[in-house]
Swiss-Prot record:
Cofactor(s) needed: Mg(2+)
Entry keyword annotation includes Coiled coil: no
The organism of origin for this protein: Methanobrevibacter ruminantium (strain ATCC 35063 / DSM 1093 / JCM 13430 / OCM 146 / M1) (Methanobacterium ruminantium)
Pathway(s) annotated for this protein in UniProt: Metabolic intermediate metabolism; pimeloyl-CoA biosynthesis; pimeloyl-CoA from pimelate: step 1/1
GO biological process assignments: biotin biosynthetic process
Catalytic activity: heptanedioate + ATP + CoA = 6-carboxyhexanoyl-CoA + AMP + diphosphate
E.C. number: 6.2.1.14
A GO MF label: 6-carboxyhexanoate-CoA ligase activity
Source organism phylogeny: Archaea, Methanobacteriati, Methanobacteriota, Methanomada group, Methanobacteria
The family this protein is said to belong to: Belongs to the BioW family.
HAMAP family: BioW
Protein's UniProt name: 6-carboxyhexanoate--CoA ligase
Key words, A-Z: ATP-binding, Biotin biosynthesis, Ligase, Magnesium, Nucleotide-binding
Keyword Kinase among record annotations: no
InterPro entries cross-referenced by the UniProt entry: BioW
Amino acid sequence: MKLMMYSIKMRSAKGGPHEEGGKHISGAERILREDEIEEELINVYRRAITHEKGKPDFINLKIEAIDEDKILYKKRLNIIQHKVSSKEEGLKLAKELLIKNTVSEEAAKEGISSIQKLKESIHGAMLLDKDSGKRIDDKGIKGVRVTGIASADIKKYKESLKRDGREGLHLEEALILASKIASCKAIVAELCWSDDPSYVIGYVGTKENYHRIPILKDKGNPVGGRVFFVDTSQLNDNYTLEDLIDYLEKQIVLIE
């Protein structure tokens, strides 16, 4: 008998629910067979209550069945590890990588500045025109939330990262997320760094590669964010900005 697939989503906050002004602490998403759910629920709960940003007083867990006929399978990005010795070097490298991937210098600078200017972490992503650097979504501080994403085989995925000497929850989740983003039509590149205060590593995602950059912010900085650079010339009546956002927010994608 074929086992059903389920989406598990967790979000936690301190000071009440997010909708009532609670401060976001952590979140997670998994797509699992029904026989994997019980064990992973424990892991997700532990993540919620042990996060470095504090212990939440609100934890929301959501479990939904998935229609397997609607799942898309996409390839994983290649990991390229870079070396830098300072935040300034890291940001300079990020800008260069973005420019090499058809983002204008003006838009690359605006993308970096957009994250640096945040007073609190944006929940989703900001969408910028790759040429002008102008923000093209209207989601405000919520941003565009990328959901419906997981590894097609989490055990094999973790084993492959371990063989490459690249273990760690941040990398596991970021690489899967970046791979879905790269598969989205009209998005040419992504810039991201974490809001976890002690985690200063960030990345530039392109259509083929995940460029891991060791330092993109100061240690102790609790603000992070992500920017997607969009080739607006690919948007038209048959593929609109709304279609692009729907793919990111709603389409179930498993990464192979």
